[in-house]
Design a protein with these regions (language model features):
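Short, well-ordered turn and helix-capping elements at secondary-structure junctions
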Residues: 7-9, 27-28
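Immediate flanking context of iron-sulfur cluster ligation sites
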Residues: 33-45
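Zinc-dependent deaminase
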Residues: 47-112
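A short, polar/charged loop-to-alpha-helix boundary motif
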Residues: 8-22
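A structural microfeature
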Residues: 2-3
């Protein structure tokens, strides 16, 4: 694991402080490059369009997520940006990995 983070939108009052973006920033800093062509991103929730766009720009080859996002998912659920052939880079997507565990954790953290 190179970097990890979580959403900080509420804490920072910043609509761009998504976990995926913050993790990309940390990874790029640690590796000293903006091209993350050997990095796989693992996330609990399916990324939004902004986050998938950043993954495309960073040339991330693979994305693995647990839970689909029925409202904003941009890796196949609502729209498919990750494998859009009109974009300069496509991302391999694996969804549903450890989904039941992720849902349980999300429910527990929401009730705290």
């Amino acid at each position: 694991m190179i970097a990890r983070d979580h959403d900080r939108m509420q804490l920072q009052q910043d609509p761009t402080a998504h976990a995926v973006l913050l993790t990309l920033q940390g990874t790029a800093r640690k590796l000293g490059t903006r091209r993350l062509s050997e990095v796989t991103i693992f996330t609990t929730h399916e990324p939004c369009a902004m986050c998938v766009g950043a993954l495309v720009e960073a040339q991330v080859p693979a994305l693995v997520f647990a839970m689909a996002d029925e409202r904003r998912g941009a890796a196949g659920t609502v729209i498919q940006l990750a494998r859009e052939s009109l974009l300069p880079h496509q991302i391999s997507v694996i969804s549903g990995v450890r989904e039941s565990e992720a849902r349980r954790l999300a429910t527990e953290s929401a009730s705290v």
